Amino acid sequence: MFLTNLTLTNYRNYEHETLSFDQGVNIILGENAQGKTNMMEAIYVLAMAKSHRTTNDKDLIRWNEDYAKIEGRAEKRSGSLALELTISKKGKKARCNHIEQQRLSQYVGHLNVVMFAPEDLNLVKGSPQVRRRFIDMEIGQVSPVYIHDLSQYQKLLQQRNHYLKMMQAREQHDEAVLDVLTEQLMVLAAKITLRRRQFLALLEQWAMPIHHEISRGAERLHIRYEPSVDVSEKAELSRIVEAYSETFAAMREREIQRGTTLVGPHRDDIAFIVNGKNVQTFGSQGQQRTTALAVKLAEIELIFSELGDYPILLLDDVLSELDDFRQTHLLDAIRKKVQTFVTTTSIDGIKHDLIQEAAIYRVHSGSVAAPS
């Protein structure tokens, strides 16, 4: 798939901008704080209905304006696609082919993107929350049902935590209510756990050979899912539900004492293991970068294998972070098949053959000069 055009209205520092894009490589060139990353973020938000940089949607609206709008047209194997996302202080409204989507989970997945930015090193060395967010966003692109289940889980988790807080303060003591909340929560938790495990197994299949090649055959990558309940790697949904039931029963008194839910997908983690060692703890910066790059390239292939279209690749100020060998491997992997957007302050750090192929856009103070 590829994005043919993009219109931004009141988005961050863009008042109104309409752009057409090349099917291959598009380089967004400009100094810092001019709007390069904002444009990259807008493409991501158009696809995912949320930002990778902020959890506050109000940050996306231009100063002193009431709303922001992102519009785009994409070409997919199945045909042309018109997308529109309006962000206001009241929330978000999404349209696909001019039809309003009742839920954002119905909207996400029409346009697929893979983002690779310097902060993606945190995928390997950052907190478990970063890795959970990563897996949730990526599964959501290929499974709208997962987004719905995750949303329901988060709502139930808030309700259960609130009730546990009241039990902790002795404002409530009816354990039958807690039983109902727990039963509803553990079914959703089991579905999420199973889908995460399946997704990570697929991701590992794609990432292992890519990582082996980037490391010049010196390293072997494994991706290990670490759920908050003890279940075998081949456990079916019913067994995972049982495991949650047993664990919740064992943890009940501690949860009431603490006033919070101590078990569930919100406590999961992912470990990246290279040559038998956790890269987060024992890996060098080079190994962490190689792992992050392999995972991002694996995402591209996984999405293609699931959906039949390659996603759009967003490289936000990341090429300068990669040495020549890793840059070459990245560019060879995407050339001729993946529409790519690259932001940079200078083309000096980008390989010459890529520059020759690229359409170059120059950004200054929220205004974009398209290629002549």
Swiss-Prot record:
One protein family per Pfam: SMC_N
Sections of the chain in a coiled coil: none
Function according to Swiss-Prot or TrEMBL: The RecF protein is involved in DNA metabolism; it is required for DNA replication and normal SOS inducibility. RecF binds preferentially to single-stranded, linear DNA. It also seems to bind ATP.
Top-level taxon of origin: Bacteria
Name of the protein in its database record: DNA replication and repair protein RecF
Originating organism: Geobacillus thermodenitrificans (strain NG80-2)
Recorded GO MF terms: ATP binding; single-stranded DNA binding
Compartments in which it is found: Cytoplasm
Name of encoding gene: recF
